[in-house]
Regions:
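A structural alpha-helix within SAM-dependent methyltransferase catalytic domains
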Residues: 24, 75-78, 116, 120
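A broad, structure-centric signal for solvent-exposed, well-ordered loop/edge residues
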Residues: 9, 50-51, 68, 100, ...
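Acidic active-site catalytic centers that drive phospho-/nucleotidyl reactions
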Residues: 3, 66, 98
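Primarily recognizes the serine-hydrolase "nucleophile elbow" in alpha/beta-hydrolase
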Residues: 1-55
């Protein structure tokens, strides 16, 4: 089963917006039955700018050449969240655009492992 105290939410592009909103507002705001928030959120290549003091610790990654998920929007969001004391890991990968997936064979290769380490750190 899923560890309800230590789960994480992952999303890419529009899916990253979904997990960010669930993190900020709680699952109940979207018809969920639990108020238990994720231990971490992992967001890949999204232009989501919203944030709140309720956001879970967040790992985010984007390609420097992303024309959809603007890296600067993601950078500003990460800085604002850090200012609220929320743990954040923000990564920009040179030479990549939108939709690099697992990063296999690209400069982003290994980002999934980095995200898992970030999540594990939040469970300590």
């Amino acid at each position: 089963g899923v560890d309800k105290q230590n789960y994480s939410l992952w999303g890419s592009s529009a899916g990253a917006r979904v997990v960010a909103n669930i993190s900020a507002n709680g699952a109940k705001a979207y018809g969920g039955k639990t108020g238990i928030r994720p231990r971490a959120v992992v967001m890949a290549y999204t232009g989501h700018a919203g944030y709140s003091e309720n956001d879970a610790p967040t790992f985010s990654i984007v390609g420097a050449n992303d024309y959809i998920g603007d890296p600067e929007v993601m950078r500003r969001r990460a800085q604002k969240m850090k200012g609220l004391g929320i743990p954040v890991a923000f990564n920009v990968v040179a030479g990549l655009g939108h939709g690099f997936g697992l990063g296999t064979g690209t400069k982003a290769e290994g980002w999934i492992d980095e995200a898992v380490r970030f999540w594990e750190k939040q469970m300590e």
